Structures are given as C-alpha cells and as structure tokens.
Amino acid sequence: MSYNHSYQSHASTHRAIPQYNPMAAMTAPAGTFLPGTKVQVGSHRVVVEKYLSEGGFAHVYVVRLPHPVDGNETAVLKRVAVPDKAALANMRTEVETMKKLKGHRHIVKYIDSHASQLRGGGYEVFLLMEFCSGGGLIDFMNTRLQNRLTEPEILKIFSDVAEGVACMHYLKPPLLHRDLKVENVLISRYGGASYYKLCDFGSTAPPRPAATSAAEGRLIEDDVQRHTTLQYRSPEMIDVYRKQPIDEKSDIWALGVLLYKLCYYTTPFEEVGQMAILNASYKFPSYPQFSDRLKMLVGR
C-alpha cells in the first residue's frame, strides 16, 4: 500500500505517460491512457485495457492485474487529478474508508492506491478497486424506463445497499456514508446473480454532535454543502441549527429516499424544496403500484 502522508515528486513517481492517438481521442478525453499503457499502483503494475468514464477530476479505466485478485484478472483504476490539500484529504478519506471496509460483500473492494505530488502543483491519486461487471445502478435503471423495476428487484437492491451501510455503522467508531444515492451503487454479477455494492466514500465521516454555536453551525453547514446531495439530505442536514446531531439516522433517511427513487425514478422532494424535507412532507405517485408494506418501509 503506497497511499500515505509522504508524497513524492511527480518526476520520480509517475510511471505511465499517456500517448496521443487521434482515434482514441474520439471516444476518450485528451490526456487519457491508451490501451496497453502500464501504470504502477502501489505494488500492482497494471495494464490499461480500456477507458471507461469521466467524472469530476477523475478518469476511470478497466485494467488487467499482474496476478488475479479473488479470482479476477481485471480491476478498475480511478485516476484523480487533485488540485489542493483539501481535495487530497477527501481522497485519503475514500482510501482509508475502503481499507476499513475491505472484505464486505456489499462494499466495492479496495485493492491498492498511490499518491504523488505533481511538479506544477497539486497531486495525482491512483485508486485500484474491483471491477463490477454490471456497471452502475443508475445506468441499469435507465435501461428499464419502460419496464420499471419490480418490487422483488427493488427489495433485493435495497437489502444489499442497507447491508453495506450497516457495515459502516457497526464500525467502532461508526462511519456515515453521507452521500447515499443510486449513482453511488455498482452491480457485480456472479454465476447469473446480481449483487449491489456501495462505492464513492469521499464524503464519509464519523457522527457529528449538534452545533453549540453559530460559528460551529456555519462550519457544519459548509461541510454538508460540500459532501452531500440536496435531495437526499435529512432535516438535520437542511437546518443545522435545529440542535440535532448528524448521525446514523441521516444515512437511514437517505436510504428511504433511495428506496423511493428505486420505486418511482424520482426523489420524494424533487419538486417541492427544502421545507418539504424539514416537514417530511411527500406523496406516493399512483403509478407504478407497490404494496403498502413497501410504502411503509419508505416512511420508516
């Protein structure tokens, strides 16, 4: 494991140089690694197989491992351009959280990581993790716009995600994910079965007691703005001055929003704003139809 607090210069640690290829540039942003590029990530020297996606400051690749990990020869490499130390701290949070949760079947598996300081300023982080062959849950949902998810499918997805969250909450001290949403769930497929796994742990944090002053409230408010998604925020995140802690209940609230989204492909507060969140005021659409038991689970 080479993700640590002593960052070396970019000149000595960057072991892969992307080559320019006009054909590759049609499908991938400029500066991405080409297939065949070798990258050293900690103790793993991986070979890029294909460019997968882009998000924020990150490029994501499917790579071939030098030796199988848990029987898998492929993995995912997340290459992140980190502009400053605050963003670097978020990446460190993600890496350290994945290490703590390693081995849980509903958490994307951490393999290795590496960070280096760039000569021109900023940092570059490589994060190597398991390849989830089923892709993202949000992409799967988009293939089912006409034929919506069934109640058994929804309960399976929700159960898997809730298990992953419970694993975080049972740590000592507990950790909150703080950014639970369908976009942060990936799908693994083994032997014809699907397993749903939590990813993106850059927002994780321990529970936080209620603010005791206006200054502390402003700090918490800023932290919430930067690390959470509005539609999934709990009332105590919307109004940090109501003197309630931000704890495991905040994640449980977000799980309810996620369950509603699985059912109706929208969040319960999409159109009605923050007052509706504060008052827990929402309605169930008439279509699709679900059992009263499932609706009660949303409300819990």
Regions found by a protein language model. Name each.
Residues 109-123:
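Short beta-strand micro-motifs within the conserved protein kinase catalytic domain, predominantly
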Residues 120-136:
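Conserved short submotifs of the Hanks-type protein kinase catalytic core
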Residues 169-189:
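Catalytic-loop of the protein kinase fold
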